[in-house]
């Protein structure tokens, strides 16, 4: 796992996606809160600062890394160079008292790369990560993570590009103001699912999408789960979701 070590990630998809690659944010790493003891009502819980949030920065490979670390430690993200998408990342991180560690997967057209990482951070400020194969990442926190996720803001039809580990293409996705997701058609591949604001109250949606049809890239009947982030300034959505085995998944970037 080296934030871009796998060559040719999402090959054939890169030039198309350059037009819409958005400045979402993201790697970072876990989130956890400590609780207070049985004291009187005037005593506030003690909170432990972690790496939860959106982070963006540059890796030693020269790629721009954009990742999100959820409150449960899951990390999701993309990396790009000069506006060209290079790949996707998924991992799990733990952090406390300014140090972090974790492991994850890097998805590319040639397969999967796995690895571990460790580093240091200042909560809601900066982060430094070193991977097991020598790669490094230095990132900064984005306060956009603090904005509540809104289904009414997310709703609309997005035109963009979708990719799996081995294939890519253009597509349009419609999301209703209740969070219903639909793309494709029953005659080829119909994708249906839901987007739900995370209970954390942050600017992240939980997504679940099921594919039905003989031409579906991930196979008929496959369900993927993951997250989505909507950037209000660019009117673009990023969705990253994996199958149950975490052996493949999809990346969608679209604009409405």
Which ranges hold each PLM region?
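Extended lipid/amphipathic-ligand handling interfaces
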Residues: 67, 91-93, 118-121, 192-200, ...
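Bacterial Sec-dependent N-terminal signal peptides
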Residues: 2, 6, 11-12, 16-53, ...
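N-terminal glycine/threonine-rich, aromatic-flanked beta-hairpin/loop signature
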Residues: 54-99, 164-213
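Tryptophan-anchored aromatic micro-motifs
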Residues: 45-65, 126-169, 251-254
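Short, exposed beta-strand-loop hairpins at the edges of beta-sheets
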Residues: 127-134, 236-248
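An anionic, turn-rich surface loop/hairpin at beta-sheet edges
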Residues: 102-113, 204-226
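Long, low-complexity, polar and repeat-rich extracellular regions
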Residues: 33, 38-70, 74-81, 85, ...
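Extended, hydrophobic interaction surfaces within ordered domains
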Residues: 97-137
């Amino acid at each position: 796992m080296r934030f871009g070590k796998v060559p040719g990630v999402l090959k054939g998809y890169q030039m198309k996606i350059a037009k819409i690659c958005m400045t979402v944010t993201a790697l970072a790493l876990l989130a956890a809160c400590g609780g207070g003891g049985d004291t009187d009502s005037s005593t506030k819980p003690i909170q432990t600062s972690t790496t939860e949030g959106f982070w963006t920065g540059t890796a030693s490979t020269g790629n721009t890394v954009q990742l999100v670390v959820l409150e449960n430690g899951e990390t999701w993200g993309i990396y790009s160079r000069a506006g060209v998408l290079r790949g996707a990342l998924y991992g799990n991180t733990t952090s406390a008292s300014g140090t972090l560690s974790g492991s994850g997967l890097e998805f590319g057209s040639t397969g999967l790369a796995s690895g571990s990482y460790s580093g240091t951070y200042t909560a809601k400020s900066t982060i430094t990560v070193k991977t097991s194969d020598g790669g490094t990442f230095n990132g900064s926190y984005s306060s956009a993570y603090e904005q509540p996720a809104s289904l009414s803001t997310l709703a609309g039809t997005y035109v963009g590009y979708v990719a799996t580990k081995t294939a890519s293409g253009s597509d349009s996705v419609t999301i209703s103001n209740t969070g219903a997701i639909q793309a494709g058609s029953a005659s080829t591949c119909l994708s249906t699912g839901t987007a739900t604001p995370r209970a954390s109250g942050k600017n992240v949606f939980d997504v679940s999408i099921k594919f039905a049809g003989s031409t579906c890239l991930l196979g008929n009947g496959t369900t993927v789960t993951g997250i989505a982030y909507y950037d209000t300034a660019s009117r673009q959505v990023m969705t990253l979701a994996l199958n149950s085995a975490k052996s493949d998944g999809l990346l969608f970037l679209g604009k409405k």
